[in-house]
């Protein structure tokens, strides 16, 4: 059976607490066998230490730096663009940084 690769995309701006909670929930996922995910996060010019906190707590997150002019839509496109250049993913999951997920969310979405 081949692996299923999921790219999780987020855009953040000065919402460190919410973003860390979202990522914490995300990394507690119970995934189906042969399934993995990578997180691609656009930091659109955060000034509250969001990127630094993410890098410290979740070093595997791909952080793409914005300059504060991307806003959510362009930030999500930027994250998707980085993910699509990194590898071929079967699925792309767009999340808001204040999304709190259940441990079986990805598994249920794939079913």
Predicted features and spans:
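A conserved hydrophobic helix/loop-capping motif in glycosyltransferases and polysaccharide synthases
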Residues: 6-18, 22, 29, 42
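A conserved acidic beta->alpha catalytic loop
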Residues: 25, 43-52
């Amino acid at each position: 059976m081949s692996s299923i690769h999921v790219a999780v995309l987020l855009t953040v701006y000065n919402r460190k607490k919410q973003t860390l909670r979202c990522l914490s929930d995300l990394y507690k996922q119970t995934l189906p066998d042969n399934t993995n995910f990578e997180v691609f996060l656009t930091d659109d010019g955060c000034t509250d230490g969001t990127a630094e906190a993410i890098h410290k707590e979740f070093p595997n997150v791909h952080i793409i730096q914005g300059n504060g002019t991307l806003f959510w839509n362009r930030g999500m496109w930027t994250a998707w663009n980085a993910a699509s250049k990194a590898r071929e993913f079967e699925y792309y999951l767009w999340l808001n940084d204040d999304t709190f997920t259940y441990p079986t969310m990805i598994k249920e979405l794939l079913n």
